[in-house]
Design a protein with these regions (language model features):
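Glycan-recognition and catalytic cores of secretory/periplasmic carbohydrate-active enzymes
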Residues: 10-206
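Single conserved hydrophobic/aromatic residue that forms the stacking wall/gate
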Residues: 1-9, 13
């Protein structure tokens, strides 16, 4: 059933301002240094840092690039956490260029989503026949939860719901496959729970 969505964290952040010099400086470091650095890492543009391939994995899964999956099974979560960080950064320090780059990455993520709603670059590229077969170790629900959190944060920060719609599709895919008389099992790493909760708070859809 549908219920009225509750106030999200974006509203809380918009009403608050850090004035303490120490924590204010930490906040500036995140917006001005950490987020740009991590963006370069995710795009394999940072010299002297181990290749991430995280954005490239999404491009390959979307059919926008050729190649093999590289990284850990949970590599997608790095992109999700960067997008969530960008969302909170945009609330306190609007940046049209950064927002446009985030929008472009969201377009790639949306293109990587499979027709049945599934979203995970490792299994889409490397082992499509083994989806949902190793919940304890393969982090599919973990990655989904982080991307759900990113989708909600970005929606609350910008009003743009493209990633939110993508993750509603993934949530529907999960619901179709788990539950009574469906796939049994529990995730090996908590995260999808808070992702689903935040999706509910943002959309009101159970």
């Amino acid at each position: 059933r549908d219920v009225a969505p509750s106030r999200g964290l974006g509203d809380v952040y918009k009403r608050q301002k850090i004035e303490d010099p120490f924590w204010g400086h930490m906040q500036e470091l995140v917006t001005d240094v950490v987020i740009p650095f991590q963006e370069d890492v995710l795009n394999d543009r940072q010299p002297g840092v181990e290749k991430s391939h995280a954005i490239e994995n999404f491009k390959i899964a979307a059919g926008l690039s050729q190649g093999e999956f590289y990284g850990m099974v949970f590599q997608d979560s790095d992109v999700a956490k960067w997008l969530e960080g960008v969302a909170y950064s945009l609330i306190i320090k609007p940046d049209a260029a950064l927002e446009k780059r985030a929008d472009d990455i969201i377009d790639i993520i949306a293109a990587a989503q499979q027709p049945d709603g599934y979203l995970n670059t490792y299994f889409t590229i490397k082992e499509p026949e083994h989806r949902w077969q190793n919940l304890l170790e393969c982090h599919e629900l973990y990655c989904a939860g982080h991307m759900m959190e990113a989708a909600v944060a970005y929606y609350e920060a910008t009003g743009k719901d493209k990633l939110l719609k993508v993750m509603e599709g993934m949530a529907g895919h999960i619901i179709d496959r788990f539950g009574p008389d469906k796939l049994p099992g529990i995730p090996g790493h908590q995260e999808v729970e808070i992702g689903l909760m935040r999706m509910y708070h943002a959309t009101g859809n159970e």
